[in-house]
UniProtKB/Swiss-Prot annotation:
Protein's gene: PA
Enzyme class, UniProt record, top EC level: hydrolase
Chain sites annotated for binding Mn(2+) 1: H41, D108, E119, I120
GO molecular-function term, one example from the UniProt record: endonuclease activity
Stored Pfam families: Flu_PA
Organism: Influenza A virus (strain A/Turkey/Ireland/1378/1983 H5N8)
Entry protein name: Polymerase acidic protein
Length: 716
């Protein structure tokens, strides 16, 4: 059989089939029937797409001899035969550009004319049996299924065969030929019998034991058993009149549908209390960098070497002293920790060869700051299950905080342009599928708008810090390692620049689970005097460590330089997401793309160029107490990016809850604006669900105040 396959099929198909089998750990020499089946399926997919094009009018056309002058685009994108990663990249890319629902399983083709994915089946059994197995496996209304058999039968979703008679006849003839060739060599019977059905997991697996008892206990009222409830759910039609549905449900449900009018909604209640404080893992607008241009020193790129080089650019160091203590901490320890960093950096200077990493001496101040030996001892459950008053720690309720103006300033700053570029053009990822050059064009325009944005600096800083901290946590678990906070950028003239924001010292990091915490102390340079907004810096101890000469319009002025020190912590999963912060670029690019798509579908042509180059047009950015704010397309890109970046920097359960619950209210208000006469029940419950997330988080409080501005203007 193996010889037959190699003679009968095109070498490219044979090679792809071998690769596919190796990917699943199967040997083409042993599983020869499977080898033949994969080749047949590949060939059917290629023949399905061969010669089918879409012309410049968008009409489907068949071209057998290559006419080099025709402006043609392939009608089908071939997904089968690519390696999995590449195949999913193509599928995702198609879904993003066309808005088609993403399939659960990898399909075989995408049809640009009918805008649907296609699953091709080739079976040695009855076509309808195989069709039902496929349909049952993929369970998607959207993916079109087309089955061929070796006997010339076929079956397709809704009897829609996609291709013309002749193209399908070519495939059937080829399959029939393969069958005859096999039969003449005595291979057909074994091949025919070797086909296994699509493996589908049985839907109704039995629930037994504790799970079964829990299921029976948690049934809604009036249901006697789980089966009885399942049958009801399966038969429940989700569309139609809400009141009718409610009456079908249960005697316990008595929801009255209230009309939602302009006068119905009230603003969200923001908490009272002391102003909220800064809780990001590193300083944002207040950060100060010590930088070197065109770095070319020995060991350039090794963080510790870069940091020492940056430190040497500053000459204004002075004896540090505490100017804003941390309320609860032992402040002299923070001061000693900074002095220790300076001393140990000096020690490195005196060594003959600079080491690549620096582990700090485990002094009492660092042990205190990093919470060494502070964690309660873990006891095995077996040893304490007989303790009769065993209980969880009482945790303190968080104290409510009010919205402070600093968080809006932070956001405004994040939307601004800096004078350096923080990403190269290819940072958002290369094109993988040949989906038009439109995608590249949009990406390049977008990159140009955001590459100098401060939010992009925060992304690169976040990626760097999280990567360095996760690396050190795994590589030096027991050490108090010194980690410089570094970023790289290019100046307006295109010169490379390395920046140092300060240092982190990490604590012990035996991180077994994703949520295990590693403590760290951060020490960051700044020119911001903490006494101007003391509430923002509640979690910090701030030292004055030097004087910096700044060039201003009136000449040189000397400004005190501060060091913001605090104890903080993070976990493996948080660092993993921090390393992925570049995704924020992608998320905001997709939001911009959907704006362009909407505009393009109105004008019935691609509007990318006009969108970015028509500088006179303004776009809505957001709501403020003054009304709807508008700005240039670049400003929209940067605002969307900043929102995405802040969602990452200030990620929290409060934000998750607020986003999910406020969205429901947003949709109701939008329905009212669109004159859809929405009705609601238990609106009070929805407000409660939203407001229980408004506790003390600065970013959530800011979003809630934006939401209130939106309500005011939406209901005018």
């Amino acid at each position: 059989m193996e010889d037959f396959v190699r003679q009968c099929f095109n070498p490219m198909i044979v090679e792809l089939a071998e690769k596919a089998m190796k990917e699943y750990g199967e040997d083409p020499k042993i599983e020869t029937n499977k080898f033949a089946a994969i080749c047949t399926h590949l060939e059917a997919c290629f023949m399905y797409s061969d010669f089918h094009f879409i012309d410049e009018r968008g009409e489907s056309t068949i071209v057998e001899s290559g006419d080099p002058n025709a402006l043609l685009k392939h009608r089908f994108e071939i997904i089968e035969g690519r390696d999995r990663t590449m195949a999913w990249t193509v599928v995702n890319s198609i879904c993003n550009t066309t808005g088609v629902e993403k399939p659960k399983f990898l399909p075989d083709l995408y049809d640009y004319k009918e805008n649907r994915f296609i699953e091709i089946g080739v079976t040695r059994r009855e076509v309808h049996i195989y069709y039902l197995e496929k349909a049952n496996k993929i369970k998607s209304e959207k993916t079109h299924i087309h089955i061929f058999s070796f006997t010339g039968e076929e079956m397709a979703t809704k009897a829609d065969y996609t291709l013309d008679e002749e193209s399908r006849a070519r495939i059937k003839t080829r399959l029939f030929t393969i069958r005859q060739e096999m039969a003449s060599r005595g291979l057909w019977d074994s091949f025919r019998q070797s086909e296994r059905g699509e493996e589908t997991i049985e839907e109704r697996f039995e629930i037994t034991g504790t799970m079964r008892r829990l299921a029976d206990q948690s049934l809604p009222p009036n249901f006697s058993s789980l089966e009885n409830f399942r049958a009801y759910v399966d038969g429940f039609e989700p569309n139609g009149c809400i009141e009718g549905k409610l009456s079908q449900m249960s005697k316990e449900v008595n929801a009255r549908i209230e009309p939602f009018l302009k006068t119905t909604p009230r603003p969200l209640r923001l908490p009272d209390g002391p102003p909220c404080s800064q809780r990001s893992k590193f300083l944002l607008m207040d950060a100060l960098k010590l930088s070197i241009e065109d770095p070319s020193h020995e060991g350039e790129g090794i963080p510790l070497y870069d940091a020492i080089k940056c430190m040497k650019t500053f000459f204004g160091w002075k004896e540090p002293n505490i100017i804003k203590p941390h309320e609860k901490g032992i402040n002299p320890n923070y001061l000693l920790a900074w002095k220790q960093v300076l001393a140990e950096l000096q020690d490195i200077e005196n060594e003959e060869k600079t080491p690549k990493t620096k582990n700090m001496k485990k002094t009492s101040q660092l042990k205190w700051a990093l919470g060494e030996n502070m964690a309660p001892e873990k006891v095995d459950f077996e040893d304490c299950k007989d303790v009769n008053d065993l209980k969880q720690y009482d945790s303190e309720e968080p104290e409510p905080r009010s919205l402070a103006s600093w968080i809006q300033s932070e956001f405004n700053k994040a939307c601004e342009l800096t004078d350096s570029s923080w990403i190269e053009l290819d940072e958002i990822g290369e094109d993988v599928a040949p989906i038009e050059h439109i995608a590249s064009m949009r990406r390049n325009y977008f990159t140009a708008e955001v590459s100098h944005c401060r939010a992009t600096e925060y992304i690169m800083k976040g990626v760097y810090i999280n990567t360095a901290l996760l690396n050190a946590s795994c590589a030096a678990m027991d050490e108090f390692q010194l980690i410089p906070m570094i970023s790289k950028c290019r100046t307006k003239e295109g010169r490379r620049k390395t920046n140092l924001y300060g240092f982190i010292i990490k604590g012990r990091s035996h991180l077994r689970n994703d949520t295990d915490v590693v403590n760290f102390v951060s020490m960051e340079f700044s020119l911001t005097d903490p006494r101007l907004e003391p509430h923002k810096w509640e979690k910090y101890c701030v030292l004055e460590i030097g004087d910096m000469l700044l060039r201003t319009a009136i000449g040189q002025v000397s400004r005190p330089m501060f060091l913001y020190v605090r104890t903080n912590g993070t976990s493996k999963i948080k660092m993993k997401w921090g390393m992925e912060m570049r995704r924020c670029l992608l998320q905001s690019l997709q939001q911009i793309e959907s704006m362009i798509e909407a505009e393009s579908s109105i004008k019935e042509k691609d509007m990318t160029k006009e969108f970015f180059e028509n500088r006179s047009e303004t776009w809505p950015i957001g709501e403020s107490p003054k009304g709807v704010e508008e700005g240039s397309i670049g400003k929209v890109c940067r605002t969307l990016l900043a929102k995405s970046v802040f969602n990452s920097l200030y990620a929290s359960p409060q934000l998750e809850g607020f986003s999910a619950e406020s969205r429901k209210l947003l949709l109701i208000v939008q329905a009212l604006r669109d004159n859809l006469e929405p009705g609601t029940f238990d609106l009070g419950g929805l407000y409660e669900a939203i407001e229980e997330c408004l506790i003390n988080d600065p970013w959530v409080l800011l979003n809630a105040s934006w939401f209130n501005s939106f309500l005011t203007h939406a209901l005018k």
